[in-house]
A protein has these predicted regions:
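His/Asp/Glu-rich mid-to-C-terminal helical/loop segments that flank catalytic regions of hydrolases
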Residues: 222-254
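Short acidic/polar active-site loop segments enriched in Thr and Asp
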Residues: 97-98, 190, 209
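Generic non-transmembrane alpha-helical segments
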Residues: 150-158, 202, 244-252
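Active-site rim beta-loop-alpha module in soluble metabolic enzymes
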Residues: 137-187
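Metabolite-binding pocket within alpha/beta catalytic cores that recognizes anionic/polar moieties
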Residues: 1-150
Length: 254
């Protein structure tokens, strides 16, 4: 009967929606999932722009400069793959079409010490959200070539040294074991973070562009945890990236 047929289709029961009073966001958005990184970015932004509109939508914030060559919004925090994709889904219904996932990452490579800027080419998924958006368990999620090239050109123009690299997306930072680190090092993985693979999968599912940009905040490559969240190398590099966001996001909108 009709009820049984409806029950077995892949059509969702719940859809992301725009609620009365929700704002419209520009087509380009920087999504900063990590709370400490979002708040640092918002503080930098408020110090740079003459006027910044800050408001809460659902469980995350939107921080939008009133004047920019390319209108854009800073969004976050939304830590972890499920929360980041919930935020991404909401941003899409509010108008986002190009989304840069920005934040800290741990380094698995000696050539990417604290403060290094990493432009991901692929994300190897070890989280659960991407599977629900059609990602295959054994296939990395790839950043689109034009987005990658645009970001790299904008970083070079801003004088920010950077390197390409593959990243590992995990749901469980406390399960970043020595064995796993060695296995991913052997695969040429440069960094580890918590959201990019899921956001790439959801972006592909919804037909929007998603790219990533990370600053190394801590090191795991020696199989010990070296924290650098307050290290001047990380703080300065993250500030430079935030200051360059208008150009970086403009490269995605081009």
């Amino acid at each position: 009967n009709d009820q049984v047929e409806r029950a077995v289709t892949d059509e969702p029961i719940i859809e992301p929606t725009r609620r009365p009073g929700d704002p419209t966001v520009p087509g380009v958005v920087a999504l900063v999932p990590a709370p400490f990184a979002y708040h640092r970015a918002a503080r930098h932004l408020k110090g740079l722009a003459d006027e910044v509109r800050d408001r809460r939508v659902d469980f995350f914030h939107l921080c939008q400069p009133s004047e920019a060559p390319v209108p854009w919004t800073l969004a976050g925090p939304a830590l972890g793959a499920p929360a980041a994709v919930l935020a991404l889904e909401k941003l899409i219904v509010l108008g986002a079409r190009r989304i840069l996932v920005l934040g800290p990452c741990g380094s698995l490579a000696t050539e990417a010490p604290i403060g290094a800027v990493v432009v991901p080419t692929e994300a190897v998924s070890e989280e659960g959200t991407s599977r629900l958006y059609g990602a295959e368990a054994d296939r990395p999620l790839t950043v689109a070539g034009p987005a990658l090239q645009g970001l790299e050109a904008a970083l070079a123009e801003a004088g920010i040294p950077h390197q390409r690299g593959r990243v590992w997306t995990t749901d469980a930072p406390y399960r970043e074991t020595r064995r796993k680190v060695q296995e991913f090092q052997a695969q040429g993985i440069v960094g580890v973070e918590m959201e990019l693979a899921a956001c790439l999968a959801a972006g592909a599912f919804r037909g929007v562009t998603v790219a990533g940009l990370f600053v190394v905040s801590d090191e795991l490559f020696a199989l010990q945890w070296v924290k650098g969240f307050d290290n001047p190398g990380f703080v300065d590099a993250f500030r430079q990236v935030v200051e360059a966001l208008p150009a970086l996001l403009g490269s995605l909108a081009a």
